[in-house]
Amino acid sequence: MVRPSPLDPRKSPKQARSAATVEIILEAAARILESKGLPGYTTNAVAEKAGVSVGSLYQYFPGKDALTGALIRRETSVLMEEAEEAARDASGENALKRMIAAAVAHQLRRPALARILDFEEARWPDVQDIRRVKEKLMALLAEVLAMPDLPPQADREVAAADVLAMVRGMIDAAGEREEVERDDLERRVRRAVFGFLK
């Protein structure tokens, strides 16, 4: 029997009203993380901010970790949609530039939240859906690196993993420094990635 992850929700909303309640709870959690950080992030604080009872919160999320997992899934799904769209570009160079732009935008859209969720995600490296997202991103990158207008790589999977680590490392470091200048960060990441691929 597969044991549920501590990041799994208790139940999924079936009706539109329930889905709206879950979204309100998630947004309240995001705002608390942004304004109070992890020390102020409690289920009671989230319920109060969302305007729901703690019991209502616990209907969907058995605890803080499940709430955090749902936030990670929500934020990551936005990044994945943007990366998938970018990877469809006919030019490898443009696809890679657009993927970098999506990653930078993702970090800078809500930088405090992104920093905290990155930290929390690192606590759960073996959770299946987190691992699946990384694998999907690496597969997308490997496909882009195979495009004929980019320099050939001896091992595309290794190159994709290196590029992903480089992009994430630079963007996370910029987030830790609380950088907000999107164009400059994008330029630096592009320079590093394309320099590496030559």
Where are these regions (language model features)?
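Amphipathic C-terminal alpha-helical segment
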Residues: E143-M147, L164-R182, F194-K198
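Amphipathic alpha-helical linker/stalk segments
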Residues: L71-R98
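Short linear capping/connector segments at secondary-structure termini
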Residues: E84-A86, L117-W124
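Short hydrophobic clusters on alpha-helical segments that form packing/core surfaces
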Residues: I25-L33, E75, L79, A103, ...
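Amphipathic alpha-helical packing segments from all-alpha helical-bundle domains
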Residues: S77-M80, K97-A101, A105-R109, W124-L150, ...
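Alpha-helical DNA-contacting segments of helix-turn-helix folds
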Residues: T68-E75, L117, V133
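Helix-turn-helix
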Residues: A20, I24, A28, I32-A66
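N-terminal intrinsically disordered/low-complexity leader segments
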Residues: M1-A20
